[in-house]
Amino acid sequence: MSLKTRYRETIRPKLLKDLGLKNVHQVPKVQKVTLNRGLGEAATNSKALEASLKEMATISGQKALVTRAKKAIATFKIRQGMPIGCAVTLRGDRMYAFLERFINLALPRIRDFRGVSPKSFDGRGNYTIGVKEQLIFPEITFDKVDTIRGMDITIVTSASSDEQGKALLSEMGMPFRKK
């Protein structure tokens, strides 16, 4: 059963009851997942940006967007409009497919993994996790990687509080670390 189907058939009714909500539309849901990678070396090394764009597209199944500098910062040797990273925003079926792969395949492949931190919520039910290496994703092969780079993964939910967001992600199978 896919994560989307499981959400509709089992997770949503359970959360409706557990959180004491009156309406099915009040139940928190995942709105989007954003993958972001900042590349400081992209200003001088265009190959790093190309490789990163390819990796992000492989991981997400969607073309990555080049992020550019908003301002010129002399100490970092960047000018306004220079490419400094890449990002992908996933919604709908691709989002659920990515979340399922991330929770069930990628997270267990992290070295010394004991669960994700329950403190990474932003106060509005959204969760951000930093990944140190892209090799945890089964789509990436070690031979094709030039440099090990990390990325930030943000899961944006419609939850009004961190508790609701944590309840949603826990039901989806996110392995939170025990305190």
Swiss-Prot record:
Pfam families linked: Ribosomal_L5 (PF00281), Ribosomal_L5_C (PF00673)
Disulfide links within the chain: none
GO annotation, biological process: translation
PROSITE patterns according to UniProt: RIBOSOMAL_L5
Keyword vocabulary terms for this entry: Ribonucleoprotein, Ribosomal protein, RNA-binding, rRNA-binding, tRNA-binding
Family to which this protein belongs: Belongs to the universal ribosomal protein uL5 family.
Function: This is one of the proteins that bind and probably mediate the attachment of the 5S RNA into the large ribosomal subunit, where it forms part of the central protuberance. In the 70S ribosome it contacts protein S13 of the 30S subunit (bridge B1b), connecting the 2 subunits; this bridge is implicated in subunit movement. Contacts the P site tRNA; the 5S rRNA and some of its associated proteins might help stabilize positioning of ribosome-bound tRNAs.
Annotated PANTHER family: 60S RIBOSOMAL PROTEIN L11-RELATED (PTHR11994)
Subunit structure: Part of the 50S ribosomal subunit; part of the 5S rRNA/L5/L18/L25 subcomplex. Contacts the 5S rRNA and the P site tRNA. Forms a bridge to the 30S subunit in the 70S ribosome.
Protein name as it appears in the record: Large ribosomal subunit protein uL5
Organism listed in the record: Prochlorococcus marinus (strain NATL2A)
